[in-house]
């Protein structure tokens, strides 16, 4: 993936990617699915370099969903070994590139070796202040919200907070990535047009970009296209756009030439 820099004033700060298509990529080449996952790791490395070069604040990669346990046992086993190997070998690169790594998801379900690598990688990179790299592993958006509810329920039980004090602002402190800037853009590869239980709370106002390109073929061109698409959009967050606002001030009717 090229290190081409994107020059935009309206550039996303936090991009999340649903990395879909590894298995189909391998099948198209007559290979086992694990070959697709290994190729996907290389695409992830290139995407991280691209994010660093373009000064993103955060990049979140959806690596393994809570639903992926339903896949064949051998594939799951291969993925766990691959994840362990990648983490163990990437620590020096994370330090060199000032990357702060965070694994979001229920890591208690992983084997002890993988849990050890996760904790080690997070500890070593904790003080880095460059790219915030989040890897969603054994993650589900519903799980995230539920574990947040459980945490805030404990606060209520202890009398730290009262039920009528709970609002969006303080609830979001109990879910993943609460310390980071919001997700501006979600990219999904592989041709599917859905979010697959990914960051349900965090992407409430995110822009979405879908591409038919399978993840191992994802490159700087597609990444740039996604950012360019984002830069052209007007994010209204429930408000009307500036043109409609002027019409409304004049006529009291914002329906002309507007999209609801």
Swiss-Prot record:
Keywords annotated in UniProt: Cell shape, Cell wall biogenesis/degradation, Magnesium, Metal-binding, Peptidoglycan synthesis, Transferase
Biological processes per GO annotation: cell wall organization; peptidoglycan biosynthetic process; polyprenol biosynthetic process; regulation of cell shape
EC number: 2.5.1.31
Cofactor: binding details: Binds 2 magnesium ions per subunit.
Molecular function GO terms recorded: ditrans,polycis-undecaprenyl-diphosphate synthase [(2E,6E)-farnesyl-diphosphate specific] activity; magnesium ion binding
Residues annotated as binding Mg(2+): 20, 193, 207
Chain residues that bind substrate: 21-25, 33, 37, 65-67, 69, 71, 188, 194-196
Presence of the UniProt keyword Hydrolase in the record: no
Entry cofactors: Mg(2+)
Gene3D superfamilies xrefs: Decaprenyl diphosphate synthase-like (3.40.1180.10)
A Pfam family matched in the record: Prenyltransf
Family: Belongs to the UPP synthase family.
Purpose: Catalyzes the sequential condensation of isopentenyl diphosphate (IPP) with (2E,6E)-farnesyl diphosphate (E,E-FPP) to yield (2Z,6Z,10Z,14Z,18Z,22Z,26Z,30Z,34E,38E)-undecaprenyl diphosphate (di-trans,octa-cis-UPP). UPP is the precursor of glycosyl carrier lipid in the biosynthesis of bacterial cell wall polysaccharide components such as peptidoglycan and lipopolysaccharide.
Quaternary assembly: Homodimer.
Protein name listed in UniProt: Ditrans,polycis-undecaprenyl-diphosphate synthase ((2E,6E)-farnesyl-diphosphate specific)
Lineage: Bacteria, Pseudomonadati, Pseudomonadota, Gammaproteobacteria, Enterobacterales
């Amino acid at each position: 993936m090229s290190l081409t820099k994107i020059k935009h004033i309206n550039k996303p700060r936090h991009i999340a990617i649903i990395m879909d298509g590894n298995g189909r990529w391998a099948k198209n080449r007559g290979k086992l699915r694990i070959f697709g996952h290994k190729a996907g790791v290389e695409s992830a490395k290139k995407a991280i370099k691209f994010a660093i070069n373009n000064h993103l604040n955060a990049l979140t990669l959806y690596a393994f969903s809570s639903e992926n346990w339903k896949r064949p046992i051998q594939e799951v086993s291969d993925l766990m070994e691959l994840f362990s190997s990648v983490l163990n070998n990437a620590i020096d690169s994370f330090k060199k590139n000032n990357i702060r790594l965070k694994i979001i998801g229920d890591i208690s379900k992983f084997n002890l070796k993988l849990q050890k690598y996760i904790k080690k990688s997070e500890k070593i990179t904790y003080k880095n202040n460059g790219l915030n790299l989040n890897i969603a592993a054994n993650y589900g958006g519903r799980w995230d919200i539920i574990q947040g509810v459980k945490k805030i329920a404990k606060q209520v039980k202890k009398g730290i907070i009262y039920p009528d004090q709970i609002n969006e602002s303080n609830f979001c402190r109990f879910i993943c990535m609460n310390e980071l800037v919001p997700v501006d853009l979600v990219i999904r590869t592989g041709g599917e047009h859905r979010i697959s239980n990914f960051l349900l709370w965090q992407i409430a106002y995110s822009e979405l970009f879908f591409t038919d390109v399978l993840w191992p073929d994802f490159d700087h061109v597609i990444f740039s296209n996604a950012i360019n698409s984002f830069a052209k959009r007007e994010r209204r967050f429930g408000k009307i756009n500036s043109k409609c606002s002027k019409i409304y001030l004049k006529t009291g009717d914002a329906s002309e030439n507007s999209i609801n």
